[in-house]
Structures are given as C-alpha cells and as structure tokens.
C-alpha cells in the first residue's frame, strides 16, 4: 500500500495551521502545502500597518520558521498555484504542469481582493493583500502626494492612518 498524501491548497494561516495540526494529530502520510506567494507564509494583518509603515519586515511576520516545515516533514511549495483539481482522479495540477495525487484535499485559499472596474491609470491603483502588493505601493509613495483609499474597513483605515502619518494627503 502506498503512503497517504494530503494536499493543502493555500499556504497562509489556515493551510499552515492545518498542516501542523495534522502532524500533531498523528497523520503519518505526506503533506503537500501549496502557496502562490514565493515567500514563506506570513501574518497578513501587519501588512496594512507595521509593514506598510516600514516598522516590521517580512521576516518578523513569518507564521513559522522554515525549519518547522522541515522538522514536520511538510513539503512547502511556494510560488506555485493549482490550475486544476481532478476530483474523480484525486489529483491536482499545478501551474508548472506537475500533478500531485492525493488521498485528502483541503482548500485553504482564503479571500481574494475584489478588483474594481475603475477607469484611469490602472498602474496607479493598488490593493493590499500580499507583501508584494505593499512593496509595489511603497515604491509610489512620496510625501505630499494625494492618495484615495477606497474602503473604510480595518485594512483601509489602517492604511489611511499609516499613509497620513507619512505626510501623504489621504482621502477615505
């Protein structure tokens, strides 16, 4: 009998927590943890505060050190996305064409940013969901520039506060 395989799609908080909990609960099979971002998994809440302000780097935001994945025999596949799921054949195919067979499959993909249909210069419209999003936004920030934040939830207001503190003219 071949070794059991659990494929987890989504290497953020839910996916990492599931992978570690599987080991804690005694799962002895393979664990394949697939994440789109190239970085090790990190906490997202600081993106719109400490990371945007430059007070906290990505290394300080890691969910777990890289060694934890190795120590728990979790095959962390960063920079990969799943293109298709064959439920009948019990396999997933990634963007690089590689297929992984599974016995158990968990979808831990989280939310996606809702892109707005706004005219104008699309290269000047930014969203905050990933560390890369924040890095791209930070490249455009200069004191005195005008910024419009669309969204008055936690992330929008936190980002607005940080941008305002950094001498940008912010409208929410």
Labelled PLM ranges:
Residues 16, 154-157:
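Glycine-rich nucleophile elbow surrounding the catalytic serine of serine-hydrolase chemistry
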Residues 1-9, 62-150, 165-171:
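FAD-binding core/adjacent interface of flavoenzyme oxidoreductases
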Residues 85-86, 156-158:
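Short secondary-structure capping/turn micro-motifs that flank functional sites
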Residues 31-34, 81, 118, 154:
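Proline- and acidic/polar-enriched loop/turn elements at helix boundaries
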Residues 153, 160-163:
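Hydrophobic alpha-helical segments that mediate membrane insertion or helix-helix packing
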Residues 41, 102, 115-116, 157-159:
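Glycine/Thr-rich phosphate-binding loops of Rossmann-like dinucleotide-binding domains
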Residues 29, 126-129, 158:
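Catalytic cores of transferase enzymes with a strong primary signal for eukaryotic protein kinases
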Residues 2-75, 162-172:
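Beta1-alpha1 glycine-rich phosphate/pyrophosphate-binding loop at the start
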